[in-house]
Amino acid sequence: MAKGTFERTKPHVNVGTIGHVDHGKTTLTAAITFTAAAMDPTVEKLAYDQIDKAPEEKARGITINTAHVEYNTPARHYSHVDCPGHADYVKNMITGAAQMDGAILVVSSADGPMPQTREHILLARQVGVPYIVVFMNKVDMVDDEELLELVEMEVRELLSKYEFPGDDLPVIKGSALQALEALQQNPKTARGENPWVDKIWELLDAIDAYIPTPERATDKTFLMPVEDVFTITGRGTVATGRVERGVCKVGDEVEIVGLRDTKKTTITGVEMHRKLLDQGMAGDNVGVLLRGVARDDVERGQVLAKPGSITPHTKFEASVYVLSKDEGGRHSAFFGGYRPQFYFRTTDVTGVVELPAGVEMVMPGDNVSFTVELIKPIAMEEGLRFAIREGGRTVGAGVVTKVLE
């Protein structure tokens, strides 16, 4: 199976469809799999109903329905997520269950931007989806060229309003349904053989060109959340955890950040499954031996990080999804002054919620932004995910949108 190994050399990019209900996200997702499969038989073709009955998965204690599809373009390998319901999108984007390197915003040309179009763009901005490509769907239902131009202008303005480069990003006009039907009639429809299928290729070209290949986790600065600490007699203190990003090796200086004053130390050993390693890298579960650090100097909930790369903070703004009662969340609203636990990486820290002006209370099932002040500092940066818990049970999920102090 030489082919399988060859595919793996392509850069991997995570994308997803976003946009208003019934604007054609799932139909487009199906059309993309059929288009890619016409060129590459290893791609699994998925019909609308196979994608629509998305399996449930759990992320940070929250149940989300998400469909995952995969496909190749000549340049890349893509993982693509599509969610059946609006609430699933909100939960998905806030928990980071499906991290997106870029999103395909689907807008019906017949309707133009709708409330969820705006909401998904805002969410993409808040949770840090860096790039958006637009697919104006259902152009076969619009006879008036001027109307199409008007919708395109509206979409570009809306994106600019939320600080995406609305004037410059790609907008592809097509019909996912027409493309899908053409491919269902002739699954081998190649590029250049059908104008609707060509529009899907145009979209794939646009995501290839416009969404940059993400920096690999191993190329980023080192960070490891501490899960456990123990002492090896005669050797010193070991912190264990899964390396979140970057690489660590013997001799590297690191800082221990969060919960107390930042402390600098040097790595004197890295091991995995009781074997010594040259280096630990993103994704590895490792034990890191730290020079001159007492057993009580480091604890679960702190992080080991490259010096100067991350700082401890107590106050931040967040975008939050509050679980509904049916999802096992609270049964009643909460108000300003609410004091739950905020679970960051490996530990809970109590914090106080301050609601924005004009917001009296927050109901279960709401998506809301507010400010939090923690009683202890946590190593924090924008884009960091957390869960909100009461007595160990998850009642919400959030993402840090702005670090305040």
Swiss-Prot record:
Q: Where does GTP bind?
A: 19-26, 82-86, 137-140
User: What residue spans carry the region label G4?
Assistant: 137-140
Which residues make up the binding site for Mg(2+)? 26
- Is Zinc one of the keywords? no
Keywords, ordered alphabetically: Cytoplasm, Elongation factor, GTP-binding, Hydrolase, Magnesium, Metal-binding, Nucleotide-binding, Protein biosynthesis
Q: What EC numbers are recorded for this enzyme?
A: 3.6.5.3
Question: Which Gene Ontology molecular-function terms are recorded?
Answer: GTP binding; GTPase activity; translation elongation factor activity
Q: Which CDD domains match?
A: EF_Tu, EFTU_II, EFTU_III
Q: Which InterPro entries match?
A: EF-Tu_GTP-bd (IPR041709), EF-Tu_GTPase (IPR050055), EFTu-like_2 (IPR004161), EFTU_2 (IPR033720), G_TR_CS (IPR031157), P-loop_NTPase (IPR027417), Small_GTP-bd (IPR005225), T_Tr_GTP-bd_dom (IPR000795)
- Give positions of region: G3: 82-85
Report the SS bond pairs.
Answer: none
| Domain tr-type G stretches | 10-215
Q: Where do the segments described as G2 lie? A: 61-65
Xref: Gene3D superfamilies: P-loop containing nucleotide triphosphate hydrolases, Translation factors
Predominantly, its location class is cytoplasm
Q: Where is this region: G1?
A: 19-26
Q: Name one GO cellular component term.
A: cytosol
Catalytic reaction list: GTP + H2O = GDP + phosphate + H(+)
Subunit structure of this chain's protein: Monomer.
**What HAMAP family does the database record attribute to this sequence?**
EF_Tu_B
PANTHER family, alphabetized:
ELONGATION FACTOR TU, MITOCHONDRIAL (PTHR43721:SF22), ELONGATION FACTOR TU-RELATED (PTHR43721)
NCBIfam families reported in the protein's UniProt record = EF-Tu, PRK00049.1, PRK12735.1, PRK12736.1, small_GTP
Q: What does this protein's UniProt record list under function?
A: GTP hydrolase that promotes the GTP-dependent binding of aminoacyl-tRNA to the A-site of ribosomes during protein biosynthesis.
> Could you say which protein family the record assigns here?
Belongs to the TRAFAC class translation factor GTPase superfamily. Classic translation factor GTPase family. EF-Tu/EF-1A subfamily.
Its recorded name reads Elongation factor Tu
Lineage, highest ranks first: Bacteria, Thermotogati, Deinococcota, Deinococci, Deinococcales
